[in-house]
Regions:
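Ligand-binding clefts of soluble mixed alpha/beta catalytic domains
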Residues: 1-161
């Protein structure tokens, strides 16, 4: 019956054969399973990067976090701006006379449109954007609100091994 506090700064799962052979999928599945089966109060604070599937596994709203807060510095998106711009605007960058300047323009646009915490809050993916100095107070209040969270009793699932 110990509540869970998750501080998120995850740049995503690194793609590659080495990570796959190292068991990243299995490890991610185990963490996903543990969070989804947890019946204790769960509070999550995104402090910096929260990208893609790795963020989802780190107790996102989609996974059922009871409360989710984000610092103003949080970046919540499918992937980082640089990587997204390389994929989305590959042709324009290749054909540009000044690719660095154009890339920076696209990165700034991506950050404004997709990866800032205000967008996540508007979409209901974040309960509140908080200042770093407020974190202790806000988290404490959240756990006080959740003190009577009903325990659903024993659950028996099939953990991914």
């Amino acid at each position: 019956n110990i509540p869970l506090l998750t501080l998120v700064d995850v740049p995503g799962f690194l793609p590659g054969v080495e990570q796959e052979h190292g068991g990243i999928i299995r490890s991610g599945a185990k963490l996903l399973y543990a969070y989804s089966e947890a019946t204790v109060p769960r509070v999550c604070v995104v402090i910096r990067k929260a990208y893609g599937g790795a963020y989802i596994v780190m107790d996102s709203m989609g996974l059922g976090a009871d409360k989710l807060f984000a610092w103003p510095s949080a970046e919540i998106a499918v992937m980082g701006a640089e990587g997204a711009v390389d994929v989305i605007h590959r042709k324009e960058l290749k054909d540009s006379d000044n690719p660095e300047e154009l890339k920076q323009k696209f990165v700034d646009e991506y950050n404004d449109k997709f990866s800032n915490p205000d967008i996540a809050a508007k979409l209901g993916l974040v309960d509140k954007i908080i200042k770093p100095s407020e974190t202790r107070k806000v988290v404490t209040e959240a756990f006080k609100e959740l003190v009577n969270k009903t325990n659903v009793g024993d659950k028996h699932g099939n953990i991914p091994l």
